[in-house]
Regions:
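Iron-sulfur-associated redox domains of electron-transfer enzymes in respiratory
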Residues: 1-188
Length: 189
């Protein structure tokens, strides 16, 4: 840990907390909010949600209740829809959702994904070697490889990562082409 660097953190909340605040504003403080995702860190991140489950835990709950996922009719998410947020699960996805250019010649943003890279970047930042740079640090290599993901049967945790990435990109492109920006903004206002 490097608590002496806490004054260098951007004064923003995580996307999970930001969405919790939007939902509380819209549905009221009595709404029960549950985060479902691949990240174990979300379980301890905030008291602004009521519970956090990993995809693996959700899959176990579904199996324990003997629910057959293939018999469930797919449905859209409740509004507000994610739009560009659909690419968040990819490595560098947060920057893409913010439409931040990662061109190494035009921006001063360094992305470090994975525990070893995270630690190395933090150490170099602490030593002053990365002066003037913003760090985007992830202990994982994107949500699609998070520790709470449900693995494909008989595969390693990192197997199928490019297939997963391609599916997310395809989904995000569909969502963006269907997004009514005026309706989306009106919902948030």
């Amino acid at each position: 840990y490097s608590p002496e660097l806490s004054n260098k953190l951007a004064p923003v909340v995580s996307p999970m907390v930001a969405m919790a605040r939007v939902l509380r504003k819209h549905y009221g403080d009595d709404a029960k909010l549950v985060f479902i995702g691949p990240c174990l860190a979300k379980k301890a991140e905030s008291d602004e949600i009521d519970a956090a489950l990993t995809f693996r835990e959700l899959r176990e709950m579904i199996e324990n209740k003997r629910i057959n996922p293939s018999k469930i009719v797919p449905a859209d998410f409740d509004p507000p829809v994610g739009g560009r947020g659909a690419i968040f699960p990819l490595s560098h996805g947060l920057l893409q959702t913010m439409e931040v250019n990662e061109d190494v010649l035009s921006e001063k943003i360094l992305v470090a994904g994975g525990r070893a890279n995270f630690q190395d970047a933090l150490r170099e930042f602490e030593q002053g070697h990365l002066e003037g740079h913003h760090l985007h640090l992830l202990c994982c290599e994107g949500c699609i490889l998070g520790p709470g993901m449900s693995p494909y049967p008989n595969t390693s945790p990192t197997a199928q990562r490019f297939t997963k990435k391609a599916k997310i990109i395809s989904y995000a492109n569909r969502k963006m082409s269907d997004l009514d920006r005026e309706q989306w903004q009106a919902y948030l206002d």
